[in-house]
């Protein structure tokens, strides 16, 4: 059953109210994303994770931590300043990475466009896209689309509206997308952008859907 973005929001709120906190959802989402990417890579890959300032970015931060634990050489690009991270869950995960010298952290929105990773994680916008794509997101999306490597989007490719399937210009194009709990209505409409799509459960109790679906 495909669901709307609003329904997903309400399910998450219900789960949080039950005691399955959003930080647990973020941990499980990021861990699932890391596992799926790791299965597609070999050796000790170089992974470049782009993180926006919301919970989609938080998922990418968790994935980066798990991939470092699996032996990957990880660089995280936070597309803004750390004090601008919008959610408690994402801030908490950034604070963990600050204590991990095994991960290279870049913040402020700038990044080295000469890098050549084996894989890229798109955790820029997710389900939170509104309006025109602006800097520094614009440059990050163009960079992702211009480089040859394995690319994974978390929740939805940045620039794709997971509710309607409408895409901004530019919009990230990836090899595969991992979305969570249930498929969002707009995602299957743009397989040209999403690549293979996998739905991963992240531990949200089925009771959280009561009154929503």
Swiss-Prot record:
Signal peptide: none annotated. One of its GO terms (molecular function) is metal ion binding. Its EC number is 5.1.99.6. Its cofactor is K(+). Keywords: Isomerase, Metal-binding, NAD, NADP, Nucleotide-binding, Potassium. Binds 1 potassium ion per subunit. HAMAP family: NADHX_epimerase. Catalyzes the epimerization of the S- and R-forms of NAD(P)HX, a damaged form of NAD(P)H that is a result of enzymatic or heat-dependent hydration. This is a prerequisite for the S-specific NAD(P)H-hydrate dehydratase to allow the repair of both epimers of NAD(P)HX. This is NAD(P)H-hydrate epimerase. The gene is nnrE.
């Amino acid at each position: 059953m495909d669901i709307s973005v609003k329904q997903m929001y309400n399910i998450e709120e219900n789960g949080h109210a039950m005691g399955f906190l959003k930080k647990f959802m973020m941990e499980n989402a990021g861990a699932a994303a890391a596992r799926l990417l790791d299965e597609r890579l070999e050796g000790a890959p170089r992974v470049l994770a782009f993180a926006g300032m919301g919970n989609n970015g938080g998922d990418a931060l968790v994935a980066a931590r798990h991939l470092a634990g699996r032996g990957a050489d990880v660089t995280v690009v936070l597309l803004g300043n750390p004090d601008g991270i919008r959610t408690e869950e994402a801030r908490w995960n950034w604070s963990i990475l600050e204590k991990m010298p095994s991960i290279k952290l870049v913040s402020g929105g700038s990044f080295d466009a000469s890098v050549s990773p084996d894989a890229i994680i798109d955790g820029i916008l997710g389900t939170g896209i509104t309006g025109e794509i602006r800097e520094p997101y614009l440059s990050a999306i163009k960079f992702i689309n211009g480089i040859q490597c394995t690319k994974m989007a978390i929740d939805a490719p940045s620039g794709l509206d997971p509710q309607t399937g409408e895409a901004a210009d530019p919009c990230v194009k990836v090899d595969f997308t991992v979305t969570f709990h249930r498929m969002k209505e707009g995602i299957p409409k743009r397989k040209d952008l999403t690549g293979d799509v996998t739905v991963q459960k992240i531990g949200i109790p089925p009771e959280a859907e009561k009154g929503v679906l």
